[in-house]
Amino acid sequence: TGEQLFAQVESTNNFPIGAGLASSASAFAALALAGSSALGLSLSEKELSSLARFGSGSACRSIPGGFVEWRTDPRSGESYAFSIAPHDHWRLADCIVILSKAHKAVGSEAGMHSAGTSPLQTARVADAPRRLALCRSAILQRDFSALVRVTELDSNMMHAVMMTSDPSLFYWQPGSLALIQAVRSWQMEGLAVTYT
């Protein structure tokens, strides 16, 4: 309508901000939903997901329910998330271990920009479609061992890229490796658990 509107937004989150837990995702998903509702817009889930993404890339994944895939269409430039299975498709639980509430020394956006300086980034990006297909298949088939392999591989590749960037980034805390080793030990004992 060309009309300028103003809003005051107050947001709280019970997760540490700037600690690598995508706290901006829930905030911008909520803002996209509240803003579009306040304007009386009837956006589809895809449109709402695309809108949320303008605030934070990860926010688009917080719009659809259940198990979600984030897709970018290279032809149209559209970037949105959609559900590949409902939340009750597979009973999994996330356990978030907060090793530090401190802000990361280098934020996620700066970290993403430095990823291109890593000699490993090209291989990671080239392999992404394969890992996505493995992850999607593992979820749809409820294959936990396949999900473990692809989840841990993707996490390790991401951290390898960060560690080999210029300047190098170490987001792991002193307890990170100890936790990974504990997960490996639990896996050996037969516990269905993974890390990322």
Locate predicted features.
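Gly/Ser-rich oxyanion-binding loop with an adjacent helix/lid
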Residues: 4-91
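C-terminal nucleotide
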Residues: 86-196
